[in-house]
Amino acid sequence: VSYTAVLVRAAGLALARNPELHQLLAGTRRLRPARVDIGLSVANEAAAAPVMQLHDVPGKPLLALAAEIERRAPEVRAEDTRTLAKLRRWGFIVPTGWLRRLVLRRLFSSLRFRKLFGSLQITVLPSVDIVASGVNGTTAVLAMGRVSERVVARGGRPAVRLMATLCCTGDHKVWDGQRVGKLLGEIARILETDELAKEVPVHEAEAATHVALDSAG
């Protein structure tokens, strides 16, 4: 089980348990979707990573979610490569900056476009310790750097634990610092307990990556 799948599952559960945070902003409309969908950034050849739509994350057990991410990632990359090829061929049709800004403004006001990114977008960059991302098309972006062993204080004594730093950037029209803190607190609680480990059968757990880790940030 990848750490990416663990984070997606934890974030989906956290949003479902805090419905006041589960909102989409489309133009002047603030909407509350019936299900928690999450957009996962998938690295590809362009600077702007394509987003994999993961529907009803709270309703999918960890192993099923991990399998879906692994199965669909190549498909998302292939589709993005085809889209980039079309843009390189036909992008000259919208050459001027003001016209491109107009197109983007119309897109960001579209509920259908907003749903492409889910209620929350997640990006994971295991090559660095800390990563933060701007909000572009979604309500908030949750970012995680590498998971590594670090020394922390536990019960007044040093201990080695798997840790990761989470950074969350939210659209201030919908979220504020307190809401972001509430979401991160719930995600940390899920990650630091054995809640997700219980979703992995014993025979799978022996071969899987440990899913409980300490979080900071």
Question: Which residues does each predicted region cover?
Answer:
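C-terminal catalytic/motor cores of large multi-domain enzyme assemblies
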Residues: 1-217
